[in-house]
Amino acid sequence: MKIKKAVFPVAGMGTRFLPATKASPKEMLPVVDKPLIQYAVEEALAAGIKEMVFVTGRSKRSIEDHFDKAYELETELERRGKHEMLEYVRTLMPADMKCVFIRQAEALGLGHAVLCAQPVVGNEPFAVLLADDLLDGEPAVMRQMVDVYDYYKCSVLGVQQVPREDTRSYGIVASKPLKEDLEAVHAIVEKPKPEDAPSTLAVVGRYVLTPRIFHHLAHLGKGAGGEIQLTDGIAALMAEEQVLAYRYHGKRYDCGSKIGYLEATLAMARKHPEVGQQFEQLLLTEAARIQPREVLPTMLETTA
């Protein structure tokens, strides 16, 4: 069965970006001229997925508005003769793309958010994309993962190597190589301490899951952080189905952190067809003005 639906858990509070996220979802933070959620949706579209399922919380209405028709804006752009921008706005949501919005009544974790999508997803395999992770790949990372699913017909986790000291921030897999860039997962642990981590292969915000995951999520108790963890559901799923870890081809920007968000903005601005060249010149100009901070030699001595 083909992957036709993508789930976007967008109910998080975004506290690391306060006050910017006090009244606006973190998924609507712009990277140059597109919000994070649009990058994720475009990645799903590039994978041939047409039905987008957004699991939302309070103060998330702007996501729904973003993917809705904007008649007043279109009329104004047409009046001003801005036909190129008008066409761009009109194609923001392709005619064959469907959006469904589901409210997550309680913030009970990523696993619970995915479980909330079951009434819409039904008994089909599906993708999960976390907009916090902006993945820049060619072809699109979700396209790569769907291709893996189409061949093996089992759940696929997007993974990358991380420093051991960072394992406490990720779900970490233990696995055995199958072929280049693909591994068979035999264990997965949510946010282990560095000394307890089975490896440094971390799951990032991309998943292709079989519908059997819903059964396991529905029977889970609360795990790490007092939440229903998707990682725990995947661990239970492995007892009856194969789960693969795929080392995707592309660059990940962790836009859940301020530095990662700034890095993504810098990278996307440099690639932008309208402002890229000017932005690179601006970077060179600003770099020439930067003076070494007094604390830098001390930091270098400490790490030497």
What role is predicted for each listed range?
Residues 8, 54, 128, 157-158, ...:
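Structural beta-sheet core signal
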Residues 5, 50-52, 98, 125, ...:
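Residues at the starts of beta-strands that form the adenosine-phosphate
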Residues 2-79, 140-144:
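N-terminal glycine-rich phosphate-binding loop and ensuing alpha1 helix
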Residues 28, 99-101, 155, 243-245, ...:
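Conserved beta-strand scaffold positions in the cores of enzyme catalytic domains, especially
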Residues 270, 276-295, 299-302:
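Catalytic, metal-anchored helix/loop core of enzyme active sites in primary metabolism
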Residues 73-76, 89-175, 209-211, 217-220:
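Conserved beta-loop-beta/alpha segment of the NTase-like Rossmann-fold superfamily
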Residues 127, 146-150, 177-281:
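Catalytic-core segments of class I nucleotidyltransferases/pyrophosphorylases
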